[in-house]
Amino acid sequence: MAVFTAVSDSDLAQWMRHYELGDVLAFRGIPSGIENSNFFLTTTRGEYVLTIFEKLTAEQLPFYLDLMRHLASHGVPVPDPIPRDDGALFGLLHGKPAAIVTKLDGAAELAPGIEHCIEVGQMLARLHLAGRDYARYQPNLRSLPWWRENVPAIVPFVSDAQRTLLEGELAHQAAFFASDDYAALPSGPCHCDLFRDNVLFAHAAPGTGHDVRLGGFFDFYFAGCDKWLFDVAVTVNDWCVDLATGVLDVARADALLRAYQTVRPFTAPERRHWSDMLRAGAYRFWVSRLYDFYLPRAAEMLKPHDPGHFERILRERIANTPALPETHTACN
């Protein structure tokens, strides 16, 4: 993501002594994103990503790294953390937790079509089912308690109309989260940030009947245990929208949701609260983007996202949300 912590050549040389990855050939910061310091790392053994965790603690980090290993062992394409010479999956770099993971093949698809959405929907459902027997627990750290804590810090910066929406939606979500239906929603480990730039695609092999192949999901450092429907809503709110207006692209949304259902059908409570969860997914990112925009941290290559994008999506979801598709017809 953005580079908050710089790494010199001597820093890197010292760090790499703890890994058996060969000689360093190339190393550069990744400017996108706003949470961690990420670097592309190429050695004589392969291509990797070095991440310095700016907020996550050493106590929290095993949930994320072990989750990636667990998912990989269940056939979900994710980055694989590389053990150090002492067997640990992370160490300290400039006093902060840091890890090296394998770099996935492919490139992000920032203008996805139907086939991309089908691939994402099916793999997201596989991820959810694969996580059912994951032993560690970590709540989604950007859920209702975080909203309650940080909305008061944001409201002095926004318009009266935005404040009304922020506070009104917070009350709506608090009531939803307290309901019996919410408690009945299926849950488990979730990615919680499965945007277009966190998924890679490669060209499919000849003769498969597909034009694209899912290369993998990455950036699991917002992951947490949450309702699976929240993860689906976050994904649909990014993969299946008109970026200018926030309006759902019904064809893409239908493709992604039907594909998901071929692996894990939605429950009756999930169907009743699809609109509420789409609103929750939009609200989570509107609040975090407002916070990062008005209360930023210093960084060498910080590029804050536009908060207005998710405000438009939230207003659109409040006004108009189609129901989940009823059929479970396979999409491929």
From Swiss-Prot:
One of the protein's GO biological processes: threonine biosynthetic process
Domain of life: Bacteria
Enzyme's top EC category: transferase
Pathway entry: Amino-acid biosynthesis; L-threonine biosynthesis; L-threonine from L-aspartate: step 4/5
Leader sequence segment: none
Keywords per UniProt: Amino-acid biosynthesis, ATP-binding, Kinase, Nucleotide-binding, Threonine biosynthesis, Transferase
Catalytic reactions on record: L-homoserine + ATP = O-phospho-L-homoserine + ADP + H(+)
Keyword Nucleotide-binding appears in the UniProt entry: yes
E.C. number: 2.7.1.39
Molecular function, one GO term: ATP binding
PANTHER family: AMINOGLYCOSIDE PHOSPHOTRANSFERASE DOMAIN-CONTAINING PROTEIN, AMINOGLYCOSIDE PHOSPHOTRANSFERASE DOMAIN-CONTAINING PROTEIN-RELATED
Family to which the UniProt record says this protein belongs: Belongs to the pseudomonas-type ThrB family.
Protein name as annotated: Homoserine kinase
Organism: Burkholderia ambifaria (strain ATCC BAA-244 / DSM 16087 / CCUG 44356 / LMG 19182 / AMMD) (Burkholderia cepacia (strain AMMD))
